[in-house]
Amino acid sequence: MRTEKEIYDLVLNFAFQDERIRIVTLEGSRTNVNIPKDNLQDYDITFFVIDMGEFLKSDDWLSVFGNIIMMQKPEDMELFPPEEKGFSYIMLFDDGVKIDLTLLPVSMLEEYLTRDKLVKIMLDKDNMIKTEIVPTDEDYYIKCPTERKFDDCCNEFWNVATYVSKGLLRGEILFAID
C-alpha cells in the first residue's frame, strides 16, 4: 500500500501540472486531528476546475493515480441522480488505496467552504482563498436537541413503530425492518 506522502505527492504533482485544476482540497477523516490515523482511511480529494468537460470525456486520465480495480461514478448512475454540479470518482486501487475524487467548478468554492469544516487546502494556484482554513470536526459533535426536536423524534418513533408489527403480521420482513 502506498504511503500518505506518496498519494499526496501524486495528487499534487498531477494538479500542479494541469492548468484546468486551480485548487485542491482534502476532506474527511484524514483532516481530523481528533481521530487516530490508519491505512484504511480514504483520501477524500476535491479538484476545483475551470473546465470539467474535458475531464468527463474519458476516464483515461485517472490511471495516473494507479491501477483501478473498482470504480463508481455516483453522478453517472441512474440509481443515485446527481445533487450538485460536481462529478465524483470513487476509486479502489490494486494496492488497497481508496481515493474519492470530486471535480467541482471553481464557481462553487465559496458554497463548498461553508458546507463542511473538515477541509484542508492542499493547493491554491491563484490565492483565491483569503482566510486561513483550519480543519475542525465541531460540526460532528453531538449536541443536546431542543425540546421540540426531542418531541418530534419521539413522535416519529411512535408513529413508525406500528410498521414493525404490520410488516411482521403480513410476513413482509423487509418492510418491518425499514
Per-segment meaning from a language model:
Residues 36-39, 113-115:
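Short aromatic-enriched loop/helix-cap "lid" or pocket-rim segments at secondary-structure transitions
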Residues 24:
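Extreme N-terminal "head/tail" segments of very large remodeling/mechanoenzyme assemblies
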